[in-house]
């Protein structure tokens, strides 16, 4: 895989490779697409996805992003009960254009700032709106 390559995910979306170090999200995106295709109503993924997570939240907290507020809140409460530090993070729609590509459906990274959030927005592209999804970035 090289910068400029175009890959196709299992759900048919095309992805322009900008950064070859952002390969984990490609694999996770396919897993999410397959979980949706299999009809799962709730999907929680856990990944050491971005170094930007540690920059945003430090070494002790993991970030939780979701397309469903109540499901994310339930996961955060469960983490608290287990003694884990989990912090709710947004999926800001105004950052989604950072993933736009002129040659594919989206790029595999969104730019130099907000890396944890754009990674979450990237993954959200592979989950249907009716699937309750929570992404935990535990880097």
What are these regions (language model features)?
Residues 1-139:
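A generic structural signal for tightly packed, nonpolar segments enriched in small/aliphatic residues
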